[in-house]
């Protein structure tokens, strides 16, 4: 009996991938991101296994082997992604060794133990509304 091409491992390299829905890619929040923020979002999304949303990290130990050298670039890109509503901080990081945890804004929250965020207040799709919120310093001129 022949093997189905759809289930064939020859169809693609590797068995893991980053799922970035078109609704996210086409959103104004994603489109407004700079190149560094988009790249960082993909590198953080790479950690998602299907059961760990809410426990993704953006620490130096994880990002340095992926080519992220500048702490300033990572900080600015991370702030940009969080402001866009694409990444939600679920646990605040603390020195000396407690990493901040994040959740991808287009997936439901999987991890609820050990997070600082109330799981009842977490909503997917916050990136859809983030583009509607004016930036700080926006004038109310007519």
Model features per residue range: what roles?
Residues 87-103, 110-115, 128-142:
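Electrostatic interaction modules used in gene-expression and signaling proteins
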Residues 33, 73, 80, 126-127, ...:
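Generic signature of intrinsically disordered, low-complexity, basic-rich segments
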Residues 120-126:
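A recognition module on extended beta-rich or small alphabeta surfaces enriched in W/G with H and D/E
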Residues 1-61, 65, 109, 113, ...:
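Short recognition helix of helix-turn-helix/winged-helix DNA-binding domains
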Residues 36, 47-108:
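Winged helix-turn-helix DNA-binding recognition segment
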């Amino acid at each position: 009996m022949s093997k189905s091409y759809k289930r064939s491992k020859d169809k693609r390299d590797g068995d893991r991938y980053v799922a970035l829905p078109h609704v996210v890619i086409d959103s104004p929040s994603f489109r407004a991101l700079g190149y560094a923020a988009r790249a960082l979002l993909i590198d953080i999304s790479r950690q998602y296994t299907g059961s760990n949303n809410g426990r993704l990290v953006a620490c130096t130990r994880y990002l340095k082997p992926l080519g992220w050298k500048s702490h300033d670039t990572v900080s600015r890109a991370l702030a940009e992604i969080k402001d866009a509503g694409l990444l939600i901080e679920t646990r605040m990081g603390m020195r000396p060794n407690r990493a901040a945890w994040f959740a991808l804004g287009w997936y439901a929250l999987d991890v609820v133990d050990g997070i600082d965020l109330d799981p009842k207040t977490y909503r997917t799709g916050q990136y859809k509304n983030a583009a509607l919120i004016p930036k700080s310093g926006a004038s109310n001129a007519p």
